[in-house]
Amino acid sequence: MTGPATRKDLMIVNMGPHHPSMHGVLRLIVTLDGEDVIDCEPILGYLHRGMEKIAENRTIIQYLPYVTRWDYLATMFTEAITVNAPEQLGNIQVPKRASYIRVIMLELSRIASHLLWLGPFMADIGAQTPFFYIFRERELIYDLFEAATGMRMMHNFFRIGGIAADLPHGWIDKCLDFCDYFLTGIAEYQKLITRNPIFLERVEGVGIIGGEEAINWGLSGPMLRASGIQWDLRKVDHYECYDEFDWEVQWQNEGDSLARYLVRISEMTESIKIIQQALEGIPGGPYENLEIRRFDRVKDTVWNEFDYRFISKKPSPTFELSKQELYARVEAPKGELGIFLIGDKGVFPWRYKIRPPGFINLQILPQLVKRMKLADIMTILGSIDIIMGEVDR
C-alpha cells in the first residue's frame, strides 16, 4: 500500500481558557498549517456577569463596589469613570485637593497595572526573572493603597464630589520614597530586558499595526500610541488636574510588540513624574464636596415607621440623574475606558453602556496572528494587554 509521506490536513487547536493570572479565561480556536497560523477565532463570555444590567438596578453609590470587578488590576480607573459621569451630569465641582489625590491614585494604579502586564508578558516569551521582580514593586504600591483606602485591591475609594477619606499622616513621604526607589527599578528592567537579544528576537517586527489601521479598528491606549498616534485622553479631555503637571505623551512609530513594550515602560516613568509633582504641590482644603448632600432624596420619616428605628445608620446619598445622555471617558492603562449613561429623572440609570478598552483592542487579534508562527500568538496577545473581567463584563 502506497500513501503520501506527509499529510496536508489543517489542524485545529484550542488555546485556553488560560489561568486568570496570565491571560484570563480567553479561548482561542486556532487553525494551523504546520506551525503557521491560518485562522484564529477568540471565544469570549466565560467571565460575563451582566455588569450593565446590574447598573440599571442600583444607584451610583450602590454600584461603586461592583465596578472594581471589571478591570480588577486597575480598579481606580473604573471607580473614576463611575463617579465622573454623574459629576458631569449634575455639574458637581470636585475640590482641588480631592482632584490631586485622585490623580495620585490613578497614576499609582496605572503603574501597578503596567507592572502586572510586564511580568506575565515576559514569562510568556520565556523570561521568568522579571515576573518575580514586578511583584516586589507592585507590593509597595499595594501597601500605599492599603494605608490610604484600607484595601489592597477593590478600593471603593472614589465618591461623587471627592474621595472617601483624606490621606493619612506620613503617607505623602512614603509615596515620595517609593517614587525615588521605583525609578531605579525601571532602570533595572530596561537594563535586563530592553537590549536583550533573545527578547528582541521574539518581539521586534511581530504584530505590526499601522497608524491608520489602528484608528480604523478603534484601538486606544498604548496600542494606538505605539503605532505613531499621539492620542492621550489626559491631554485631550483635560480631566481632573492633569494640565497643571509637566509630562509628555509617550509614543513610538514602529507599531510592533516591541513598540508597545517601550510605550508602557516609558509611561511608568511619566506616571512617577506626575505623582511627584502632585505630591509636592498638593493643596489644603476639603477632600469632598459636602454641597452634594443637597442632591439627596430622603423622604420624610414617620415617627413610628419601620425605617425610623434605623435612622442612626448613615444613609448613602442618592443622586437624581437628570433626563439626558452623556458619554464620559478616562485614559485607563489599557486604553479608553468610557461609559454611556442615560438618566431618566430617577436614582437608577436608564441605560449604562460600558466601553471597555480591552474588548475593542482584542478585535484585531485574529488579523495580527494570521500568517505568523504559533509561538508568536502569546507574544501578540500579551502585547495587547487584556483583562477578561472588563472584556466580558
From Swiss-Prot:
InterPro entries referenced in this protein's UniProt entry, alphabetically: NADH_Q_OxRdtase_suD, NADH_UbQ_OxRdtase_49kDa_CS, NDH1_su_D/H, NiFe-Hase_large
Subcellular location as annotated: Plastid, Chloroplast thylakoid membrane
SUPFAM superfamilies reported in the protein's UniProt record: HydB/Nqo4-like
Keyword annotations: Chloroplast, Membrane, NAD, NADP, Plastid, Plastoquinone, Quinone, Thylakoid, Translocase, Transport
GO molecular function: NAD binding; oxidoreductase activity, acting on NAD(P)H, quinone or similar compound as acceptor; quinone binding
Catalyzed reaction equations: a plastoquinone + NADH + (n+1) H(+)(in) = a plastoquinol + NAD(+) + n H(+)(out); a plastoquinone + NADPH + (n+1) H(+)(in) = a plastoquinol + NADP(+) + n H(+)(out)
EC number: 7.1.1.-
GO annotation (BP), single: photosynthesis, light reaction
Domain of life: Eukaryota
Cellular component GO terms, alphabetical: chloroplast thylakoid membrane
Membrane disposition: Peripheral membrane protein
Function, as annotated: NDH shuttles electrons from NAD(P)H:plastoquinone, via FMN and iron-sulfur (Fe-S) centers, to quinones in the photosynthetic chain and possibly in a chloroplast respiratory chain. The immediate electron acceptor for the enzyme in this species is believed to be plastoquinone. Couples the redox reaction to proton translocation, and thus conserves the redox energy in a proton gradient.
PANTHER family: NADH DEHYDROGENASE [UBIQUINONE] IRON-SULFUR PROTEIN 2, MITOCHONDRIAL, NADH-UBIQUINONE OXIDOREDUCTASE 49 KDA SUBUNIT
UniProt similarity note: Belongs to the complex I 49 kDa subunit family.
Assembly and binders: NDH is composed of at least 16 different subunits, 5 of which are encoded in the nucleus.
This protein's name: NAD(P)H-quinone oxidoreductase subunit H, chloroplastic
